[in-house]
Amino acid sequence: MDEILSWGGPDATLQPEEIRSALAEILAHYGTGSRVLAVPPDFTRFYSYAGQITAMLQQLLGDRLTDVLPALGTHVAVTDRERETMFPGVPASLFRVHDWRTDLVTLGEVPRELIRELSENKLDWPWPAQVNRLVAEGGHDLILSIGQVVPHEVVGMANHAKNLLVGTGGRDGINRSHFLGAVYGMERIMGRADNPVRAVLNYAAENFLAELPIVYVLTVIGADDHGELAVRGLFAGRGLECFYRAAELALEVNFTMVEEAPEHVVAWLDPEEFHSTWLGNKAIYRSRMMIADGGRLTVLAPGVGTFGEDPGIDRLIRRYGYRGTPATLAAVESDPEMAEDLSAAAHLIHGSSEGRFEIRYAAGGLSRDEVESVGFTALDMSDTYTRYHLDTLTDGWNMLPSGERIYYISRPALGLWAQADRFRDEYPRST
């Protein structure tokens, strides 16, 4: 049976010294050998506390920590500034860059029959279980997969095997997992620890990762009474159970259920963290189950200056926009470039309200024409900032001087919000 090491709870605030002590216990329990690989997330998961954990591990392990491989997926590499900010004190010489095009080993395939069943007969292909060559063939005695369990639009609850199979995976695996989640339905997945995408990852973890010396180190992060982020939980284990324990706490900490569906939600995107709609549309994903039919979502995004994280995806977003599921599926059928980039197709589906509510974007680095060309309503950044008195807003319900009542979200990537009638747990746990 998988033994779980865990600390914290829904009201806990784990201090750095407690976390360092817990990490020392994890290393003592599982053993380190002489070669350890750490796989943390990249800067887009800055608030996961994984950077500080990696720094603590480097202090505890010394020369035994031989490699740090940020789980980039298809994101751009971590810059020197991002690395120094997120991983304080960790030598630059330890960092490796995942290239999802070339640095891959295929460990096996999830059979097409299972994909067909999980997708309700919408998809008919196998799923390749791929990881970075350093994970599969690096000769490490211990692989520490580090990250935050938090509600997620593709996989329901982020992390565990996703960190390796998607974060250090290849194009086909990333594209197909995203597209599976999109065709099954994002609102049927978000916040649920079990769903078709997680079932695929669990199958791959149990059948293809089990022989690797992987230990998952998982955090749960929540806001304290003063709105500051706190580490609520820390979990470690080799199998699936540590993920389910963390997901249970994350649902308690990161999920907000509202009885009344807001007519207007305003979300802020930190300009240091969000530079594209590819990442910034988490404001849409995480709030969509809360917004009233015919309502509005206003996204304040001063740092957003592009759509995609790479030129190819940016081009597809500009070509097709966020027009809803039928239009996107038609593009997949008619355009070979879109058919080859199913993660872009999934992103376009996720980023549409399907006509249910209006999405208004105040993007600091995109023109009005650019914003409106993809199907959003464009707003002026400075006017919007002033209109909504951003300096005075608190998370949750606010009454503006104009008399308008809005719901404000300052960190959409760290939670999930839903109106009670829109959240139903319908998928059985995979084992």
Q: Which role fits each region the language model picked out?
A:
Residues F274-R368:
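C-terminal catalytic subdomain
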Residues R45-R64, G280-I291:
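Histidine-anchored nucleotide/phosphate-binding helix
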Residues R35-F46, L69-G73, S145, V265-W268:
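Short glycine-rich or small-residue beta-strand-to-loop segments that form or flank ligand, phosphate
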Residues R96-V97, R101-A261, M289:
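Conserved, well-structured core segments that form the ligand-binding/active-site neighborhood
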Residues T13-R20, E354-T431:
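Extended hydrophobic packing segments that form well-structured cores
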Residues A22-L37, L61-G62, E137-G139, F255-H264, ...:
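Glycine-rich phosphate/diphosphate-binding loops that line cofactor/substrate pockets in enzymes
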Residues M1-E18:
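N-terminal amphipathic/basic leader segments beginning at the initiator methionine
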Residues D67-R116, G321-E340:
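Long, charge-dense
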